[in-house]
Amino acid sequence: MSPAHVLEPTYRRLKRALMEGTWPIGQKLEAMRLADEFGVSMTPVRDSLNQLVGEGLVDLTPGEGYRVTLLTEHSLRDMLAVNVLLLESVADPAPRKIDTADLAAPIDTYADRVGDVFSIFALGSENRFLRQTGDLISDRLHIVRRLEPDVLPNALEALAELEGSALATPSKRVQALRRYHDQCLANVSRLIAVLAEQGST
């Protein structure tokens, strides 16, 4: 096992690169090459890749090695369906008090802002497993969320509604969640097509 002071930054850097689409979906990830690029030994890279296999961002095939997890229309639809169910389940009960400072945090990108507001919604649940599952789904969807402003017809409006609903009534949160996810589901084919196009360039 790698020392924490080496493993943690290696893991975070690799995870962020995967979430940002640095490598095309399905591309082989060579631990030796990544170790050279990151300036670390193979051990923290392998440990990080194995952790990311558990999180669903990397696939491991015995005898073949690591690859960026493939994302299909079917798997994207499944993740979106589970995501909205999880978030709706914490929208109905009275959530724990949301700190308005969380909503004002400096988040750079559209994809980060979507993930951030969903994390805030999940704070309404005392169920730690539910929150962790939501975070895992959010991390896997990040690569697609980067594309939403260019693919979804009303992406920015949907995001503004989500952010505004964080401090609104449960019914408003559910309404915002459904509108956002309905828009995503209606454009799954296009999102996957654009993702594939990016990987081929």
Task: Annotate each PLM feature.
Residues 1, 49, 71-75, 104-105, ...:
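A ubiquitous short alpha-helical element
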Residues 1-93, 193-201:
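Short linear motifs at protein or domain termini
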Residues 2-10, 112-119, 138, 142, ...:
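Long, contiguous secondary-structure blocks with strong helical propensity
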Residues 25-27, 61, 130-134, 173-174:
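Short, hydrophobic secondary-structure boundary micro-motifs
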Residues 69-126, 164-175:
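All-alpha effector-binding/dimerization core of bacterial HTH-type transcriptional repressors
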Residues 75-82, 110, 133, 151, ...:
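Amphipathic alpha-helix face/heptad-repeat signature
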Residues 82-93, 116-156, 185-190, 200:
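Hydrophobic, amphipathic alpha-helical faces that serve as interaction scaffolds
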Residues 147-201:
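C-terminal all-alpha effector/ligand-binding and dimerization domain
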